[in-house]
Every structure is written in structure tokens, then in C-alpha cells.
Amino acid sequence: YIIGVQANIWGEYIQTPEYFEYMAFPRLLAMSEVQWTQPEHKDFESFARRLDKEFERLDYCGVNACRNFYEVNQAGAWNKSQQTYEVTLNTFCPDADIYYAVNDSTVNTSSSLYETPIPLDEDATVYSAVYRSGKPLGKVTRKSFAVNKATGCDYTCNPEAGWEHLNKGFGLTDGRRGYARDMRRWISFYQDTVQIVVELKKPQKVKEVAFSSLWRPVNEIWPAR
């Protein structure tokens, strides 16, 4: 058995030395922090502030480190009290500002400064970036959100979903599209026929109903038809 900490990299997926460095750093710095810092002295904010200097060292040594630390995390959710869909932005990077734009890939200090959740009333793509002292620290991140008349609504399935990992009970109306690489966004049914009833918030006209389905034969997942 292993006493202490352990970090694994699955070599069969690593094709170049540069990709190995990308997968290893700054994760090895975090592992060292966990192992060598006494519990009473562990402080994530302190570690995050010290990463700036560590990235300078890695750059000087020519290490191809992953810089996701300087990117924006985007999350969307239905605000029941405000009855609106909101996108929240955050970053692990301390003492930094987040600038964003909706449906505009150009993000700079002239863009909107993020201070409160961003309300959306229709399909939109949010672009965002981290800045400090007017200088960009990372890449522009983007995420698309599906906002429509069903977003945030309750629904029932007959029969019930067989598998639903995230936002149970709202996986179909949470404003997030499913992607092949992220199984958590999908819900599954094992039966041939499914009835889904969406409770719209008020009487309104519906012109079109659309949905996505996943096809992954290796996992015995077949598209709806």
C-alpha cells in the first residue's frame, strides 16, 4: 500500500512530452502542497496567490503547463425566486476581474465587468475572460446555454428516467445541452416508448418541440427515433 499521496497519469493517452507536461503541471504543485503542508497551515487562497510565481518559473523552464487556473468557470441555473435563467461566472485566480460578452467573442476591458449573475431570456453564448490590472491572464472561455419556454419548468416522465446524474428532475429543462464527452448531462430511458409532460409556467403558444439524443453503441446507448 501507499503511505502519503499518489498522482497517476495514464501513459497510454499521452502522445507527446508537451502533453505530459500539460497534464502534470500545475497538478504536481497542488499534490506537493497537499503532502508537505501541515493541516493547520493549509490555505487554498495562499496557494492560489503563490501560483503566479510558480507559473513564471514553469515558463522560464519551458514547461508546457496547463493554464486553466486563469480561465473562467461558467454555470447556468434557473432562479426560482426571480423566475429567470442566470449565468454565474467565477475563477480560482485571486485579485482578478472577469469581463464578459453575450453572443460576442470579443472580450476585453471595454466589455461588461462581471458583478452579478447574468440573466438570459433566450439561447445565448457567453464569452468571458480573466483580467488583472487591465491585462488578460488566460484564454477567452465560451459556453452556450439553451433558454426557451421550457427552461426551468417541472416535468414528468412515464416511465421514469432510468439514469439521471445532474440536476435530477431538471435534466431536460436546466438550460444545458448534453455533449458526447459529458455523460452527466444526459438522462436515459430503457423502454421503447416514453411520455414526457412539461408543465409550462403559463398558457402560451408552442410552435416547435426539439430535443437531442446521444448515440454511443460502445455503451449500448441508442438515439431516440
What are these regions (language model features)?
Residues 91-97, 203-206, 224:
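Short proline/glycine-enriched turn/loop motifs at strand-loop junctions of beta-rich domains
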Residues 106-114:
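Short beta-strand segments within Ig-like beta-sandwich modules, predominantly Fibronectin type-III
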Residues 115-124:
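Solvent-exposed segments in extracellular or luminal domains encompassing
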Residues 139-203, 214-223:
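Disordered, acidic Ser/Thr/Pro-rich linker "stalks" and the adjacent N-terminal cap
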